[in-house]
Amino acid sequence: MKQRGWTLQCTAFTLFCVWCALNSVKAKRQFVNEWAAEIHGGPEAASAIAEELGYDLLGQIGSLENHYLFKHKNHPRRSRRSALHITKRLSDDDRVIWAEQQYEKERRKRSVPRDSALNLFNDPMWNQQWYLQDTRMTASLPKLDLHVIPVWQKGITGKGVVITVLDDGLEWNHTDIYANYDPEASYDFNDNDHDPFPRYDPTNENKHGTRCAGEIAMQANNHKCGVGVAYNSKVGGIRMLDGIVTDAIEASSIGFNPGHVDIYSASWGPNDDGKTVEGPGRLAQKAFEYGVKQGRQGKGSIFVWASGNGGRQGDNCDCDGYTDSIYTISISSASQQGLSPWYAEKCSSTLATSYSSGDYTDQRITSADLHNDCTETHTGTSASAPLAAGIFALALEANPNLTWRDMQHLVVWTSEYDPLANNPGWKKNGAGLMVNSRFGFGLLNAKALVDLADPRTWRNVPEKKECIIKDNNFEPRALKANGEVIVEIPTRACEGQENAINSLEHVQFEATIEYSRRGDLHVTLTSAAGTSTVLLAERERDTSPNGFKNWDFMSVHTWGENPVGTWTLKVTDMSGRMQNEGRIVNWKLILHGTSSQPEHMKQPRVYTSYNTVQNDRRGVEKMVNVVEEKPTQNSLNGNLLVPKNSSSSSVEDRRDEQVQGAPSKAMLRLLQSAFSKNTPSKQSSKIPSAKLSVPYEGLYEALEKLNKPSQLEDSEDSLYSDYVDVFYNTKPYKHRDDRLLQALMDILNEKN
């Protein structure tokens, strides 16, 4: 009897478990606002039922006759519970044979599961492509990749998109490129033939174009080199740099086969010597204009440009008319440490950033190389632009109807500032967008860009408008050393006219400035919304007396703002060279934008924690603006803010002021630990490091020296804050604590 009772209990328990499991499965279902029904009588009967019962008739289900799909007019899009009452009412209709509410079904692709990104491809250098995959050993480290793999996992790999590389040629028979080579996207303007093959020489001087093309379209899973960002795209090469370059050659290259080529990638420009001011000639400018108007069947060619490698020479890409063009997407670089590399230039025209080389300890970029070889040492902004071009190819596969301006909006709206947040110079513009003269709107995020470009939800941006503001009564204004010229520019942004602008894109300030030493000029423009932008920073090597003649200084920093109000132009010379003199001859402000706000901008930009910065992979809390007080001239010159003979009370006062500015405790700990573990060898090893101390004023002076000038927001009294490079030690660095330690030791040495 007991045995029978036990059996009944077990059976009951089993049935209960099965019932719970079934209900659990059912509970996990997500029911959608769609009903399938079998109805005889054709579409007329289905339409009548829909109208009577409050449905929208979505149509016949596939090729199944008498089967229709309905959507209820007053039901949520998704629900965890089925709407039994709605289903019953539909089923009770005599004309309905069968009805069922639809629910989401989980389906998985029956492909072999991958253990990790390391196993995605058999290409031998794939594991070295740190910028395309998450190579972290622990989740506590920040992600470094461009978020490309999630796009590939959707099957988006660049199919149907054509990119051409304007450079010194393309080794098109390279076994990692040949399968994706497109002869219709290729030409040799140096020798005027259809073969862009590079000229070999003993130094492999003409490897540049092949390396850039490899980044974009190296074939996947062919046991050769690495993997291109858009590894199923088609790539061509324009050979135009290996010989005499003329305006005609540039125009022919920029405008080559615009009905076939989608994206043009260029990693070149005028000399990055810190003293050149040059842009496209008349013909090249017309080629750009033709490309955006007629290219890609009227949707506009996509021009991707490297922002320049003149950082060591103090160059400024605002003096490069190619990156400064409204028609190009100017791409800067970030190192593996998430920092602005030594070669990078600053300017207000840079739109976004991708990864490239940094210090000698950082990994570089992998690609194909001459003589059917491979390389892991591709460097500079030359390597950043092709990565961006590859990402844009992924977006064009996802949505071929994107216009050239759509692409720029997508870049602005999805680039991430957080991975680069430990760099100085970030500011929020009047539209709530984070922007930086070193990085534009931040690091490219391929997944976010492609997701936003989804043709099911993306709406092409409104028609572009142009509004020109100028003062016909303006009289030339004189400028001398240690002087300034301020021009107030009130505008209604062509309000009430067909070309009225309510949402900004690019802003151009076209000016003629005569000056005895061009490199001493500093130009800022403050928008009606209060965003201050450095249009031109000093260039020590630029001693030219030629000034600027009708030069377009371009900025993207006010993107999304309403331009109505008063803008302020300020031109200064703080060099102290008393012999300097000149004048502002004429100017005009050119606003580019739209009369109505683009659809995707009607809600504020939301920044995510993707690729969160953690102080160069050290797990230290993120730096914030240490202080917000205005800089003194000493701070702008990189000098210590407290002289050697300062009293302790003055040091204490300054420390109290900085505590109110919320200095980072993590930085203090980092300085202390760095000093402790790197003390001179004469210190006894028996003394515990915890007993070592750094003078409190030394800690704060190090913080000031490293952060104060460069962390300040732009204001009338901090024109130079975005361009002070004290933060980036000129000596090779490995991690942030090395630079902090170096600054601290410099301070202590000065005191001893």
UniProtKB/Swiss-Prot annotation:
GO terms for cellular component: axon terminus; dendrite; extracellular space; membrane; neuron projection; neuronal cell body; perikaryon; perinuclear region of cytoplasm. One of its GO terms (molecular function) is serine-type endopeptidase activity. Residues 28-110 form a propeptide. Residues 129-450 form the Peptidase S8 domain. PROSITE patterns: P_HOMO_B, SUBTILASE, SUBTILASE_ASP, SUBTILASE_HIS, SUBTILASE_SER. It comes from the Eukaryota. The active site is at 167 (charge relay system), 208 (charge relay system), 382 (charge relay system). Its EC number is 3.4.21.93. Residues 460-597 form the P/Homo B domain. Its cofactor is Ca(2+). The keyword Disulfide bond applies. Keywords: Calcium, Cleavage on pair of basic residues, Cytoplasmic vesicle, Disulfide bond, Glycoprotein, Hydrolase, Protease, Serine protease, Signal, Zymogen. Disulfide bonds join 225-374, 317-347, 467-494. Pfam families: P_proprotein (PF01483), Peptidase_S8 (PF00082), Proho_convert (PF12177), S8_pro-domain (PF16470). The gene is Pcsk1. CDD domains: Peptidases_S8_Protein_convertases_Kexins_Furin-like. Residues 1-27 form the signal peptide. Glycans are attached at residues 173, 401, 645. Residues 631-662 are annotated as: Disordered. Involved in the processing of hormone and other protein precursors at sites comprised of pairs of basic amino acid residues. Substrates include POMC, renin, enkephalin, dynorphin, somatostatin, insulin and AGRP. This is Neuroendocrine convertase 1. InterPro entries: Galactose-bd-like_sf, Kexin/furin, P_dom, Peptidase_S8/S53_dom, Peptidase_S8/S53_dom_sf, Peptidase_S8_Asp-AS, Peptidase_S8_His-AS, Peptidase_S8_Ser-AS. The keyword Cytoplasm does not apply. It is found in: Cytoplasmic vesicle, Secretory vesicle. Belongs to the peptidase S8 family. Furin subfamily. It catalyses: Release of protein hormones, neuropeptides and renin from their precursors, generally by hydrolysis of -Lys-Arg-|- bonds. One of its GO terms (biological process) is response to glucose.
